[in-house]
Amino acid sequence: MDVKTYQYKGNQELVYTNNSPDTLRKVYYHLFNNAFQPGSEMDARIQSIKDPDSRMVNKVKVDGKEVKESRIKTLKPNEIGYLRISNFKQDGVVATAKEVGTILEVTLAKPILPHSKTTFTLNFEGQVPIQIRRSGRNNAEGIELSMTQWFPKIAEFDFEGWHADPYIAREFHGVWGNFDVKITIDKNYILGGSGYLLNKNEIGYGYQDEGVVVTLPKKTKTLTWHFNAPMV
């Protein structure tokens, strides 16, 4: 995470189990941050409904009348959110991935048979948007980064099929899983995250075991926080 530009990059490995009786030839991911861009489906919805979320609009005067204008509509390039994917592979073989708004559609290199496993790997780059709803940067409480749904998130597949719905500020429907996450960020930032901090005695900031003193070398510029979150 670059705390000056609010941009971040990473890589993801996902071991996917097909618990269904169906053979899967495609998979879908959510790219939620892409909703926070002018012209997105969420932006269009805000502009077209009568009662938009008050957090997502500005009140402006047009011809002497007060109207509600989408905050997303006016975001500048360094204020938007985005999530971009590259180098998508299935078991080491390149698969075809296509981004459509907040959804990534992947045509698999090989089908996933019922009750079998496969491994997906990918690289991603993102930018944290100005806070519009629950996530974003520089919120009113003084939190620098409120990170929710910030990574490429596999969509849910169940008896109804794929739940690859575009994000328009409605509720989430996701997959339960075991997460192992490493986040490298400026050493002056204190993180909170789901699960357990595995390297607390390297991080300090009050997370360390009682009696442990954590002293960082003066040349240290960043820290890598290692979280493990089972079944979330």
Stretches with model-predicted labels:
Residues 53, 60-90, 97, 123-232:
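Extended, low-hydrophobicity, Ser/Thr/Pro/Gly-biased non-transmembrane segments
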Residues 102-106, 118, 223:
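Short strand-edge motifs at loop-to-beta-strand transitions and within beta-strands
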Residues 91-105:
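Extracellular/luminal ectodomains and secreted, surface-exposed scaffolds of diverse proteins
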Residues 23-56:
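Surface-exposed, glycine/proline- and aromatic-rich loop segments on solvent-exposed faces
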Residues 10, 113-122:
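Short Pro-Gly-centered flexible turn/kink motifs
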Residues 1-9:
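N-terminal, polar/Ser/Thr-rich
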Residues 16-20:
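Asparagine-centered strand-capping/turn motif at beta-strand->loop junctions
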Residues 9, 22-29, 40-41, 132-134, ...:
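Short, hydrophobic/aromatic beta-strand segments
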